[in-house]
């Protein structure tokens, strides 16, 4: 054993990150047709032009909250990989229980 503790094989010494890509404006990757498809699935017939930016904003806030909670669960378990169960628990904590992904 190399003294790295539990689950420490092959993870290196954990030195400084060399490159961290700056992520910005990725919310525009949620395209107008994608939002339209979601609305159609929800039974919407006509969509105002202002809806697309509003939807992106709401989706961004929702995902930030879920991901923050999921990462908190991951860190508490001393893992580096966010699992499906972390996301399920994060959604449950927010009152949006999701079935079909274990647990």
UniProtKB/Swiss-Prot annotation:
Residues 1-20 are annotated as: Disordered. The nucleosome is a histone octamer containing two molecules each of H2A, H2B, H3 and H4 assembled in one H3-H4 heterotetramer and two H2A-H2B heterodimers. The octamer wraps approximately 147 bp of DNA. PANTHER family: HISTONE H4. The modification N-acetylserine is found at residue 2. Core component of nucleosome. Nucleosomes wrap and compact DNA into chromatin, limiting DNA accessibility to the cellular machineries which require DNA as a template. Histones thereby play a central role in transcription regulation, DNA repair, DNA replication and chromosomal stability. DNA accessibility is regulated via a complex set of post-translational modifications of histones, also called histone code, and nucleosome remodeling. Keywords: Acetylation, Chromosome, DNA-binding, Methylation, Nucleosome core, Nucleus. The modification N6-acetyllysine is found at residue 17. Its main location: nucleus. InterPro entries: CENP-T/H4_C, Histone-fold, Histone_H4, Histone_H4_CS, TAF_TATA-bd_Histone-like_dom. CDD domains: HFD_H4. This is Histone H4. Residues 1-14 have a biased composition (Gly residues). Residues 17-21 bind DNA. The modification N6-acetyl-N6-methyllysine is found at residues 6, 13. PROSITE patterns: HISTONE_H4 (PS00047). One of its GO terms (cellular component) is nucleosome. GO terms for molecular function: DNA binding; protein heterodimerization activity; structural constituent of chromatin. Pfam families: CENP-T_C. SUPFAM superfamilies: Histone-fold (SSF47113). Belongs to the histone H4 family. It is found in: Nucleus; Chromosome. It comes from Mytilus chilensis (Chilean blue mussel).
């Amino acid at each position: 054993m190399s003294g790295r503790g539990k689950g420490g094989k092959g993870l290196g010494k954990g030195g400084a990150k060399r490159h961290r890509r700056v992520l910005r404006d990725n919310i525009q990757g949620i395209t107008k047709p994608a939002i339209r498809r979601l609305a159609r699935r929800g039974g919407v017939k006509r969509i105002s032009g202002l809806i697309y930016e509003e939807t992106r904003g709401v989706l961004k806030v929702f995902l930030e909250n879920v991901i923050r909670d999921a990462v908190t669960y991951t860190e508490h378990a001393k893992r580096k990989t966010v699992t499906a169960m972390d996301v399920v628990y994060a959604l449950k904590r927010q009152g949006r229980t999701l079935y079909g992904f274990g647990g």
